[in-house]
Design a protein with these regions (language model features):
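A short, hydrophobic C-terminal helix/tail in secreted or cell-surface proteins
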Residues: 421-427
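Carboxylate-rich, polar loop motifs that coordinate divalent cations or form catalytic acidic clusters
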Residues: 1-421
Length: 427
């Protein structure tokens, strides 16, 4: 049985649709079109509209017609040491930042078509944040935090160990990095918050809730800014509200002993506040009132572990729980719907991939990859998810068809990458 990987680019037509399917045209790309690698790990569209793919055989560029491949060859000077790439992001200057399988980070110059290693030695990257201000942060396996700034005119990179450069004698695990509307950069750690403020060439670092190593630590997990307030989530039901004008924090306590891992904006002045093990809260900012949604209060909720959440343009929540599938929550009528796709044999798809992907395109279509597998679009009128696939290649989804990546571009095209057993495909 031959395994093949297929990249489908779908053009969705923004008109009325027939029941059960969206009007669309498929364009299929395989190795015959120049996309020779069968594992694509990350997709982005740059500010010029060009598509980029991080693969296990280097970096691919797609201009809408042809694929170009950039990778290391023996004896060349391209600047890349490992062709297996895991993650790509674009910065404000148009460079493509690349994270490789051997935990190194490179900056790719699309104009010169060259990779450049960051000016930092002896590190192993774990995660990478590329902020709108142009700065890049790299969290390392060794629990270092590398801060990379780019000169706005020469584009020269400067990399420093954040903790050492600010005389911080001990480092803590990094939970997230966040940039606010004033271009302050916040580092959320297992032990407090740090805020980096830049004024020209001058930098100022402020710390909040940082305790000595032997004291009880205050971790921070997620951040959200709105209405002149920045919200930081923490442990034991705490959310800290920061006022940028006064520099003051106010602590909000929710009735739960669970850590609050997620905060998102709903419609109007409501917030979705998700916990690690006790469901979620809907918090009304103007009144300070909240409502607690967990399996005790709402038995239709499958479990209490909020793994991830996406808020769509209608202000409705799509939640990944520990239970496979996807949970849809409408805050207006407080209705829960749990969806799980079935394969072409009528069985629930639960063993394909654990991730939940939710994407909305410019035409207003909402695409759902439930935890467990498969791909569907949301039929909002009938409140159903409808399986979506190419009938020329498949008779339906199965556990062997693994969606490895999805992406919607600025033109409304939907990129779908999945593996398939050739023996099961239609001609």
């Amino acid at each position: 049985m031959r395994r093949i990987v297929i990249l489908l680019i779908l053009q969705i037509i923004a008109t009325g649709f027939c029941f059960g399917q969206l009007p669309h045209t498929f364009t299929q790309y395989t190795s015959e079109d120049g996309l020779s690698q069968n594992t694509i790990m990350s997709i982005l569209q740059d500010d010029k509209g060009v598509m980029w793919f991080a693969t296990w055989d280097g970096l691919y560029k797609f201009d809408g017609y042809t694929f170009n491949n950039y990778k290391a060859h023996p004896g060349d000077s391209i600047g890349l040491s490992n062709n297996r790439l895991d993650n790509i992001k674009e910065d404000r200057y148009g460079y493509i930042w690349v994270q490789s399988y051997n935990h190194q980070v490179y900056r790719f110059n699309p104009r010169l078509e060259r990779f450049q290693a960051i000016p930092y030695d002896n590190y192993l990257s774990l995660d990478m944040y590329v902020l709108p201000c142009g700065d890049v942060w790299i969290i390392t396996v060794q629990n270092e935090l590398i801060h990379i700034s780019t000169h706005p005119e020469t584009h020269e990179m400067k990399a420093t160990d954040f903790f050492k450069s600010h005389q911080i004698s001990y480092s803590e695990p990094i939970k997230s990095i966040f940039q606010d509307s004033r271009e302050n950069q916040w580092i959320l750690t297992e032990n407090g918050l740090y805020r980096l403020t830049r004024n020209g060439n001058e930098e100022k670092l402020s710390s909040y809730f940082v305790a000595p190593p032997e004291k009880d630590k205050q971790p921070f997990y997620d951040a959200l800014e709105n209405n002149h307030t920045i919200y930081f989530t923490s442990k034991q039901g705490c959310v800290y509200e920061y006022n940028p004008d006064t520099g003051q924090f106010v602590r909000q306590e929710f009735p739960t002993g669970s850590s609050i891992k997620t905060i998102r904006q709903l419609k109007k002045d409501k917030l979705f506040i998700g916990t690690a093990s006790d469901g979620f809260f809907v918090y009304e900012q103007s009144s300070g009132n909240h409502r607690h949604y967990n399996t005790r209060n709402y038995p239709s909720l499958k479990d209490n572990q909020i793994k991830a959440v996406y808020i769509d343009t209608n202000g409705e929540a799509w939640i990944r729980l520990n239970t496979k599938g996807v949970t849809h929550f409408n805050p207006e009528n407080e209705q829960f719907d749990h969806f799980i796709l079935q394969d072409k044999y009528g069985k629930d798809i639960v063993d394909s991939r654990p991730e939940m992907y939710i994407y909305e395109d410019v035409n207003g279509s909402l695409w759902v990859h439930p935890s467990g597998g498969g791909l569907a679009w949301y039929d909002r009128k009938n409140n159903r998810i409808r399986p979506f696939y190419n009938p020329a290649l498949q008779s339906g989804w199965s556990a062997d068809n693994k969606v490895t990546n999805v992406f919607t571009d600025k033109q409304g095209n939907f990129c779908l990458l999945y593996t398939s057993d050739a023996a099961d495909d239609k001609a």
